[in-house]
Amino acid sequence: WKPFVGAMKAEVTDNNGQKYSVETILGANELYDVAKFKITAKTNAALFAPSVVANSAAWIVMPSQAGAPIKANIDKVEKFMTKYNYCVLSTTASEKYNGAPVLNDKGQIVGIYNSNGTLQSATDAKYANDFVLTGLSQNDPTLLQSGIRIALPQQPDEAIIALMLSATKIESLRMATINDFLQKFPTLNNGYVTLATKLLANGEVAEADKTLQQAIAKTTAKDEAHYNYGRLIFQGVTTAAIADKAKAQGWTLDKAMNEANEAYKLNPAPVYKHLQAQIVYTKGNYQQAYTDFEALTNTPIKNPELYLEMAQCQEKLNASNEAVLAMLNQCVELCDTPYMETSSPYFLARAQQFNKMGKYR
């Protein structure tokens, strides 16, 4: 593992001198100094030794260009984590052989070589082979010591978590993770909407539109795909910095509503009705928007945002200050405690209303 620490890229050289780039990290352990990674090639895996016994011979093998194999003796075999072998060796192999495979007389892998100057050992390669990534592996302190991309888990639910956590990565790693997700899980909406959101933030409206239409064509949850399309159209139309590009792409509030309606027709989820209500408000039909927001307070998505939106409708409808304040009080009452940063817009809106009413205390 040590060679990967601080590295932005790495190469593996096989016995024929062929070099392969390391594509992703699949796991690592600092204590045993082992790592699991994927290279940009398909190769035939060596066989693991079915058993290892003390007082047997082994060979520490490097690519032939780097030198001949060095013989070692397995002095002692210890178990760790109940099923893996840790072999103490006697050998003349130096630290430059660290990470090399240790093979038995049959060419089967006994372990991964490590020398710290005073102790020579081989850690069971099956231990590294059994590493399994989870979504939270994106924030694993050990794996973050390397600049090489952490791979996505195999399970879709875990991969979705990994995709979300990759938002903090540098641009190249973030984009590689998104593209990897799209390749591995082409029928899930998460990859498409993540990419489209990123494209939209960069002002690439046409590419975002193309990505969202691909989602509608390829994903299994069509309602979610239509909702994401409508939501990002709405975002594009109402964001001043990209409004002109959105208009040029044919994005309008009516188009956003059509997508929201299609999503709701496929699956009458409250979140889709919420998008419809937001579009109605933006189009200036404040009474209908208020009615729609109010209806949503009787659904599972009852939250502070709905009451803030109802307060905004009340203001547009010239309701009394007290009526607006009542809605904003509901906002604050629904905020989770202890209060988090996400609650600040609701406290700010209420404070502004108090100021408007002359209630400065």
Model-derived regions, located:
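Residue-level recognition of tetratricopeptide repeat
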Residues: 197, 231, 238, 278, ...
